[in-house]
């Protein structure tokens, strides 16, 4: 026997269904599990993220935040609509287009940042612009007039990295636009920056701000690493300083120009993951001085042998724990590294 089930919102993208004692049980990709009996139904929603997380993760005041988005190796869209996951006091909240029609157009969330003044969420969509999530599930989307459209893709507003500085200015990587670095200042005004280097596809992604308020930016697609100091004032462009770091002594000494990630450790050192290992900047205060600052390559010891840390491996993400140890995600697994980078503690 067949049954026609028509409950608006109960089923959106069903995967499996069974009939038990004439009751229907339907597993749905977005609506979890539903039990239909007679003219009523119940939904069983799992206390979990809606899907796996591929984007950024952070913790602020015992609340965990993660973005689900990702891009292809060539920085093309994945059309991932899973959104943002928040874990607070043991309960998960999934914020995405399937739950809120107001953000239906926002896909591929990559970067995330928390405004410490009001603990609201800012998240970057790779193509859909910048999203501000306010209490009560109120949403504000920034695109035209604030962000720049992608060159060659004029309806796309790509946000690939976010970071607040100590003055509560929100720095934004506007990947692929003519001015790929933007800032929303603490007073709500905006400013955009033209990067004074030729960059393939004007690619700018992750942003990390160091102890000297310098902005470190991953420039993927083989462009290397960018550093920016706005000087005494964001509005005064005449004392701005820029550096583009890459391979070679005196030029940054990175293991590769194919930079994948950056992280700041407890000493203020900047750890840079590339497609060919790790470099560490331990002299960040000299970055814009005449002598500059080159990365050192940590040497890891394994018995009677020693080699450069993750040489020949693609380093995709680096996180620093409370003991200053480094958690490193590579294409070959996850590793826990000692604070100085000279010992592999665990491999997963």
Predicted regions located by residue number:
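Carboxylate-rich, polar loop motifs that coordinate divalent cations or form catalytic acidic clusters
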Residues: 1-348
């Amino acid at each position: 026997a067949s049954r026609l089930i028509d409950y608006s919102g109960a089923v959106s993208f069903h995967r499996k269904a069974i009939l038990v004692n004439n009751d229907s049980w339907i597993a749905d990709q977005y609506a979890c599990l539903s039990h239909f009996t007679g003219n009523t139904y119940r939904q069983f929603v799992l206390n979990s993220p809606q899907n796996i997380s591929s984007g950024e993760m952070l913790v602020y005041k015992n609340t965990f935040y993660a973005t689900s988005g990702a891009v292809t190796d060539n920085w093309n869209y994945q059309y991932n609509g899973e959104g943002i996951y928040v874990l607070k006091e043991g309960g998960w909240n999934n914020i995405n287009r399937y739950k809120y029609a107001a953000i239906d157009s926002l896909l591929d969330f990559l970067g995330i940042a928390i405004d410490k003044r009001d603990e609201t969420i800012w998240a970057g969509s790779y193509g859909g612009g910048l999203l501000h999530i306010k209490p009560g599930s109120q949403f504000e989307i920034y695109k035209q007039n604030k962000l720049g459209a992608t060159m060659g893709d004029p309806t796309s507003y790509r946000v690939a990295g976010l970071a607040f500085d100590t003055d509560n200015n929100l720095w934004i990587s506007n990947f692929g636009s003519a001015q790929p670095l933007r800032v929303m200042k603490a007073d709500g005004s905006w400013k955009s920056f033209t990067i004074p280097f030729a960059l393939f596809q004007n690619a700018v992604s992750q942003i990390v701000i160091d102890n000297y308020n310098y902005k470190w930016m991953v420039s993927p697609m083989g462009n290397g690493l960018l550093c920016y100091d706005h000087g005494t004032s964001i509005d005064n462009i005449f004392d701005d300083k820029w550096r583009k770091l890459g391979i070679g002594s005196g030029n940054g000494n990175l293991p590769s120009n194919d930079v994948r990630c950056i992280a700041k450790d407890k000493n203020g050192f900047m750890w840079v993951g590339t497609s060919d290992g790790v470099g560490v900047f331990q002299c960040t205060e000299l970055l814009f001085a005449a002598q500059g600052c080159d990365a050192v390559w940590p040497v890891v010891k394994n018995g009677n042998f020693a080699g450069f840390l993750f040489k020949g491996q693609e380093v995709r993400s680096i996180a620093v724990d409370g003991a200053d140890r480094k958690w490193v995600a590579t294409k070959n697994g996850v590793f826990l590294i000692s604070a100085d980078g000279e010992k592999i503690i665990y491999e997963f």
